[in-house]
Amino acid sequence: MLLSAKTQAESLCGLEIQADSADMARRSIAMNHLEDRISVIQGDIKEADKLFAAASFDVVTSNPPYMIGQHGLTNPEAPKAIARHEVLCTFEDIAAQTARLLAPGGSFYLVHRPFRLAELIVTLSKYKLEPKRMQLVYPYADREPNMVLLQAVRGGKPRMTVEKPLVIYKEPGVYTEEIYGIYGY
């Protein structure tokens, strides 16, 4: 829903593998009267080619599961484990389907963990999704980054811009001015 507030896109379509999460998203869309702009389909990214026509999206966004194998603690609650760990799909699955769904010149935006950055760039390039912009996200200015934001373009030419870092908090519970600006406070 934040995307609908921050973009002029005529329509947004979400794909969610977990039925409960898809239902929750649909209820939120209805409560905010956004049914005319946003739809949610419950389905598997690995089968997106059966749900959507090739090259049918100008933009694809993803907040994929970050952890592989035994990285981090696996949540005993299945829905949370599926959201955080590559249980039902891998980043390669997401990249392969994104390359098929994006129109030539279309953009893929994703958030991931910096410890997987090399793998992400290699995988994106493998599927002709050229990394164009990268921004590291820091929880605090004096900490290591814990997220990376990437934009890749289908069929783009090689050249990546590294944006200035994004810092979330000035101090515990207090956002930086940049974050307030992003969220419109």
Predicted features and spans:
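A short acidic, Gly/Pro-enriched loop at the edge of an enzyme's catalytic core
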Residues: 50-60
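SAM/dcSAM-binding transferase cores
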Residues: 144-185
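Conserved SAM-binding motif I beta-strand of class I
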Residues: 11-16
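Conserved SAM-binding strand-loop segment of SAM-dependent methyltransferases
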Residues: 33-45
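Mobile active-site "lid"/loop adjacent to the S-adenosyl-L-methionine
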Residues: 64-93
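Conserved Class I SAM-dependent methyltransferase catalytic core
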Residues: 88-145, 149
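Conserved SAM-binding loop of SAM-dependent methyltransferases across substrates and taxa
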Residues: 1-10
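Conserved SAM-binding loop
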Residues: 25-26
